[in-house]
């Protein structure tokens, strides 16, 4: 099994706003995603996972860690990853940079609206 890894710079170099908006619009024509969120806590730290399954397209799990203490260490407070899985057999197909997805999906939704 070969898993594609898409880091921020590599992914951003391949994206453009018009194509992204077209893709989001096409996605809205697919069956509605089943979505579930989970939160885990340790003191002030948080792990958030959002899972989505679009029948006929696939599954995505976006996990984010929020470590407020990182600020004092000059480390990013929010980190994460997006894992994409096959709709056919559930195998991992890609690992995508969290910040790439957050930036482009959030802005793309706003542009499309």
Task: Place the predicted regions along the sequence by residue.
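N-terminal ligand-binding/catalytic initiation module
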Residues: 1-103, 111
């Amino acid at each position: 099994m070969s898993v594609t890894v898409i880091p921020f710079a590599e992914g951003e170099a391949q994206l453009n706003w018009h194509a992204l908006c077209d893709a989001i619009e096409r996605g809205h024509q697919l069956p509605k995603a089943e979505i579930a969120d989970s939160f885990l806590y340790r003191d002030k730290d948080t792990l958030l996972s959002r899972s989505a399954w679009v029948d006929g397209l696939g599954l995505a799990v976006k996990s984010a860690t929020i470590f407020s203490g990182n600020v004092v260490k000059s480390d990013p407070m929010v980190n994460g990853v997006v894992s994409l899985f096959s709709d056919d057999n559930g195998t991992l197909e890609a690992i995508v940079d969290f910040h790439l997805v957050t930036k482009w999906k959030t802005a793309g939704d706003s542009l499309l609206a």
